[in-house]
Regions:
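Single conserved hydrophobic/aromatic residue that forms the stacking wall/gate
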Residues: 269-278
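Hydrophobic secondary-structure segments that place a key small or acidic residue at a functional site
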Residues: 98-99, 109-217
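Membrane-interface segments of envelope glycosyltransferases acting on lipid-linked substrates or membrane lipids
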Residues: 4-5, 85, 205, 214
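Short, strongly hydrophobic transmembrane alpha-helices
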Residues: 20-48
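Hydrophobic, regular-secondary-structure patches
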Residues: 43-115, 122-125, 215-218, 236-240, ...
């Protein structure tokens, strides 16, 4: 015990005689511990932020597709599959395939490249950005195959110089086919598009339209698809919706257990806390 006290006295004497070095040592220890705490806190915050962003971008989305690399694959999807899922699976907000087309658009403010995405009304829910003016296209619009579209705020400004564009028209040309498009809705810009514009990126018109328009007016094949999306009411239902929809599809196509139909629940892509070794 006496020896321990002797060690303590020597330590205290060394601290007193080397105050500067002792303070720096203590400061280094404090900074080191604080840095570890900060890194852990930032890691947790970034992980949470990334997960929130993923939830916002793909919350509730489930992709169904076929493995096209397999020679024995016989499955394709059509409108009857989409209707069956909406009619028979609970907690489904929307079902839609997607077709994309690149072309040119001409409005009062000039000519631009345009990226057009066609789908069913459920296409609205594949993006988290809200409709800020007008409305999204409805099933009636799809049944009519009308020349209607929803564009982004930046696209509206590029084409017309304003976001007050509901009812206005512009010309869009795809593969030599020109159609007059009527704007019925405006969607809020994505963060990535705003960053691109701020950085001087090329202005591209972004539009969404009924799939039937692309088939009837642009002559795209809209009868069969190799992939489509199901959007659940909430990401909490994704697992159940995905399994129920897969069971339904396999039964409809007679391929149960053959792994011809694949799925990926985009809401289940999360950054987890690293596993610690014990």
């Amino acid at each position: 015990m006496a020896q321990i006290w002797e060690y303590i006295k020597i330590a205290l004497m060394n601290i007193k005689s080397n105050k500067g070095r002792s303070v720096l040592t203590m400061l280094g220890i404090i900074i080191g511990i604080a840095s570890v705490i900060m890194v852990i806190a930032i890691g947790n915050g970034v992980r949470g932020q990334v997960n929130d962003e993923l939830e916002g971008l793909a919350g509730g989305q489930i992709a169904f597709y076929v493995d096209s690399t397999r020679k024995e694959t016989t499955v394709t999807f059509d409108q009857t599959d989409f209707d069956a899922i909406e009619a028979n699976i609970a907690h489904v907000k929307g079902v839609t395939p997607q077709l994309s087309a690149w072309g040119t658009a001409e409005g009062p403010k000039g000519n631009f490249d345009i990226s057009m995405t066609g789908g069913d009304p459920g296409l609205q829910y594949t993006s988290s950005e809200p409709i800020v003016k007008g409305r999204y296209f409805s099933q009636d619009d799809c049944d009519a195959g009308g020349n209607v579209c929803v564009i982004t705020e930046s696209s509206a400004v590029s084409l017309f110089g304003t976001t007050d564009v509901i009812g206005l028209t512009f010309e869009a040309t795809f593969w030599g086919v020109t159609q007059e498009m009527r704007v019925i809705g405006v969607r809020k810009d994505t963060a990535s598009s705003l960053i691109s514009m701020a950085g001087g990126g090329t202005e591209i018109i972004t539009a969404e339209c009924p799939l039937s328009f692309m088939g009837n007016k642009l002559y795209y094949d809209i009868d069969d698809f190799s992939e489509f999306y199901v959007i659940a009411d909430n990401s909490a239902y994704c697992t159940q919706v995905a399994q129920d929809a897969l069971n339904l599809l396999e039964a409809r196509h007679g391929v149960r257990g053959e792994n011809q139909i694949m799925m990926q629940s985009l809401s289940l892509i999360h950054i987890s806390e690293p596993t610690r070794r014990t």
